[in-house]
Amino acid sequence: MDYQLTLNWPDFIERYWQKRPVVLKRGISNFIDPISPDELAGLAMENEVDSRLVSHQDGKWQVSHGPFESYDHLGENNWSLLVQAVNNWHEPTAALMRPFRALPDWRMDDLMISFSVPGGGVGPHLDQYDVFIIQGTGRRRWRVGEKVPMKQHCPHP
C-alpha cells in the first residue's frame, strides 16, 4: 500500500510541528488498515513483541504486559491492546511510516498500533514526545489540547 498524506508538509512543519496540537481529519488519503485486530492480538502473544493491555472498571485503571496467552477473560468493554514496533514484525504496516520520512530518522521511533473495544482507551495522559495518531477502523473520541496541569499518577513503581 502506498499511503499518501493529504497535508501540505512545509505548512504543517511551519505552523504545527512541535508548536501545538492539531487534528487533521482524513490526513491519509484512501486509508486502509494494514493489520487486522486478530493479527495484532496474535503479535501480542509473541515473546519478542512489546505489548500491553490497559483496562478500567469503576474508575480504576490497570495495565498488564504481554506476551498474552488468551483474551477470553476480557469481556466486550473497557479495554485496549497496545503493541509496540508493529512495523518491525508485520511488513505491511511498515508502509505507514513512509509518508513521515520527511522527518529525520532520529525523530522516528516505531509504529504502535492499538485495538480497543467500546469504552476502551488508555485514559488522559501527556506524551513526552511527538505523536502522529492515525485513526483506523472503528470510532474513537479524541481530545487534544495545550498542556494543562495534571495530577501525577504512578500505579506501577
Positions of the model-derived regions?
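Active-site region of the double-stranded beta-helix
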Residues: 1-15, 28-35, 41-157
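Glycine-rich, often proline-containing surface loops adjacent to acidic residues and nearby aromatics
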Residues: 19-20
